[in-house]
Structure formats: C-alpha cells, structure tokens
Amino acid sequence: MATLDVNPELYQAQLADKIARLKAMFVDYSMPELEVFESPVANYRMRAEFRIWHEGDDMYYIMFNQETREKYRVDQFPAASRLINDLMPLLMDAMKGSPILRHKLFQVDFLSTLSGEILVSLLYHRQLSEEWITAAQALKQRLNDEGFNLNLIGRARKMKVVLDRDYVVENLQVNGQPYVYKQVENSFTQPNAKVAEKMLEWAVDCTQESKGDLLELYCGNGNFSLALAQNFERVLATELAKPSVEAAQFNIAANQIGNVQIIRMSAEEFTQAMEGKREFNRLKDAGVDLQSYRCNTIFVDPPRSGMDIDTCKMVQGYERILYISCNPETLQENLQVLGETHQVVRFALFDQFPYTHHMEAGVMLERKK
C-alpha cells in the first residue's frame, strides 16, 4: 500500500485537481456536465495491508514510502475504516505476547465492512502447526469477546488455515434498499464502501426506464448486477474468476433476486460466443440460450487495461453502454472506438481513492441517432 497523507483539510483541493484533470482528459470529446461523487474525508477504506517489523521484543506494523522505499511505523491508519483502526492495536498487543503467533509473521491484511464484520489474514514465512491453530483460535475468541465480529486466516507457502470463514458479508444501501454482498479474501471488492454505494445509485439512475435485458461483462461478485436487476427484465453477467462467480451466486440467493444469471467466461470468450465463432458447453450446461436475450444495454467495468478492440467492437452492437472505469486513460482509448457509433450522455467522477492520483470514472453512452 502506498504512502498516504490523509489530511481532511486538503480533501477539497485534491478533489478539485482530479476534476480538472478528468475534464482535461476528455476535452476533445463532446461530454455532458461532470457529476462528482465525493468520498468521506477519512476512514473510507475497507481494506488495508501492513508489513510487520520485528525489533527485539517489540513488533509493529510498517508501510513503505513509495518514493524512498524507506519503512515507517504505522500504529493508526486514518484512511482505513474505524473498525480496522480499533482492531489494529488490540491485535498487535495480543500477538506480541504470543511467541507462537509472532514467530516469522511478516504481513497482516484486514478486510472490513460497513456491516461490522472483519476478516484478518496473518501471513507467515513458516508452516503453521496445530499449536499455531490453538493459539489463533484463542486470539479469535479473545477479540470476539471484546466485541469484534472477526474471522481469522493463517497463510504460509501452499498453506491456508481458515478460522472460521474466509469471507465477510457486507451490507450496502442503494437508495435506502439494503443489498447483501459476500466478499471473499483475496478477491476484488470496491475498497471505498461509501463511494461504492454512490456508484451503484448512479448506475441505477442511469438505467431507469430501460427496456429488455442487460448484459454485464466483468461482473465480479455481482456488485452491480444485483442493484441493476430492478431496471431490467433479465440480467446476464460474465466473470472469469472462480471465487467471484461463487460469491455472485451466493449474493443472488442472499438477496432473493430471480432475474440474474452469472456465467463463468472471459469477456473475450463471451464475444466469440455472441458472434457464433465458438460454442461453449458451459453455456449449454447452465441452460443459457443467448438468442433468447434481448439485451439493449451493456454494462462494463473492465480491469485497468480497459477493453481490447474486439470487445469494444462487440460492445458497439448495443443501444446503450454503461462503462465504469478505474483507469480513465484506457477509458479515453476505448471512447475513441465507442465514440464512432455512440455519444456520451452521462459523465461521472467517483473519488474512490482520496489523496492519491487514482480516479474512477463512469460514462453512459447511447447510440447516435
């Protein structure tokens, strides 16, 4: 994790800089007015990872300065959720007093939620014994007795010990409606939960009064699929990562949403299937008849690399395109293609990563008349 200067007094200035940069990047496009969604100024980040430094009998969390690579001690981390900050000193004190828990511990990862659940992963440069499991169970019990809703994972080379779950269940509010999301350790989740709620509300607003079905590429754990399902007859969503697909299935059931179908495919494979270039048994096995879907709208939330040219061409086949981007530079590249056939009708900046140069953007495109 990068060096971060969390200074609430500077929040508006850093946001203004992002607004100016994003507008400048798209000055050559006919863009509508930019909608801006702010972050909480502190305690916004639901995940955090720290290295562990051992110094005699002492042990503490450290991070590294990105520019100098110098380590520095971290006892509290203002970017992280209050839950993480509350747990950090108690966890460290408990581990310091346990030779078996501290021996060759080199990293601690936290995954917290707005729902109150938290998952802690302890990473070791040694194999984990039965003695470690006993000590870890006692640690978990001790912290839960202090009021935390905590699960623990121990990791070592080719080894993973789960006490008792390797996921948390998050609860996000979308226009007052609660949605339950299973978030699995080491799988992608939106790091800024409050901004994630705003992104979902914006996407729901963009797709009001939609007709037909929705196709979604790169759906992850179904984060957007579930919230958007209310605006469509059916949702067909694709995702390649197996843990994310399994989490998405859990989330569909937990939210009792009956019109979402998730299939495990890459965007590139799905493009081939849609164009009839290849047949996939997994589509048949899942009972998915692509020809039965009437998808007028497509939703894409690609990785930082954006969409490849073939996927862009496939996406151009839809009347409306909703595109969430964690890298506006690749969004810019993709818009050079999409802009041939579509025009941008909504444009948004989501400040997922305050006090960094990273920006999250959203655009809604409609086919040119």
Curated annotation (Swiss-Prot):
GO terms for cellular component: cytosol. The active site is at C326, E360. Its EC number is 2.1.1.-, 2.1.1.35. It is an enzyme of class 2 (transferase). Disulfide bonds: none annotated. S-adenosyl-L-methionine binds at Q190, Y218, N223, E239, D301. Keywords: Methyltransferase, S-adenosyl-L-methionine, Transferase, tRNA processing. It comes from the Bacteria. GO terms for biological process: tRNA methylation. It catalyses: uridine(54) in tRNA + S-adenosyl-L-methionine = 5-methyluridine(54) in tRNA + S-adenosyl-L-homocysteine + H(+); uridine(341) in tmRNA + S-adenosyl-L-methionine = 5-methyluridine(341) in tmRNA + S-adenosyl-L-homocysteine + H(+). One of its GO terms (molecular function) is tRNA binding. The keyword Chloroplast does not apply. Dual-specificity methyltransferase that catalyzes the formation of 5-methyluridine at position 54 (m5U54) in all tRNAs, and that of position 341 (m5U341) in tmRNA (transfer-mRNA). Belongs to the class I-like SAM-binding methyltransferase superfamily. RNA M5U methyltransferase family. TrmA subfamily. This is tRNA/tmRNA (uracil-C(5))-methyltransferase.
